[in-house]
Regions:
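Two-component/phosphorelay signaling modules centered on CheY-like receiver
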Residues: 10-29
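Conserved phosphotransfer microenvironments
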Residues: 50-68
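CheY-like receiver
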Residues: 114-132
Length: 132
């Protein structure tokens, strides 16, 4: 699975990348702002894990919506889930940070199943799924 990480905290992004790569996924890019995230779409993205508050401000919700429109499966990961209100149409949901390694693993398994129409595993327990 080709994953885009949209996260401006470098150490958090690297932790997520390590978990995903250990599971055999390819991290196509780590984007710390909207411009980098838009550039990464051209690399082919199956799934995006998107923070809300990035280097250029509260641009995560808009980037998530753009990624959904481009065909990516999107899950938000943020310390401020309330900022999403009812959610972003087409996105899977939001996982509150801090996120443990096991939650990243569960999230990736869940997102892969959603993306590729596989048997649905149990979602991460703290995932707030959007209903649209």
């Amino acid at each position: 699975m080709r994953v885009l990480i949209v996260e401006d905290e470098w150490l958090v992004a690297l932790e997520i990348q390590n978990v995903l790569e250990d599971l055999g996924h390819t991290v196509v890019a780590i984007a710390a702002d909207a411009r980098k995230a838009r550039e990464a779409v051209a690399m082919g993205v199956d799934v995006a894990l998107v923070d809300l508050n990035l280097r250029d401000g509260l641009t995560g919700p808009g980037i998530g919506a753009e990624l959904v429109r481009s065909g990516a499966t999107v899950m938000f990961m943020t310390a401020n889930p309330g900022q999403l209100g009812a959610g972003v149409p087409g996105a899977i949901g939001v996982l509150p940070k801090p996120v443990e390694h096991e939650e990243v693993k569960q999230a990736s398994i869940y997102l892969e199943a959603v993306r590729f129409g596989q048997a649905m595993p149990k979602p991460p327990s703290r995932l707030r799924e959007f209903t649209h």
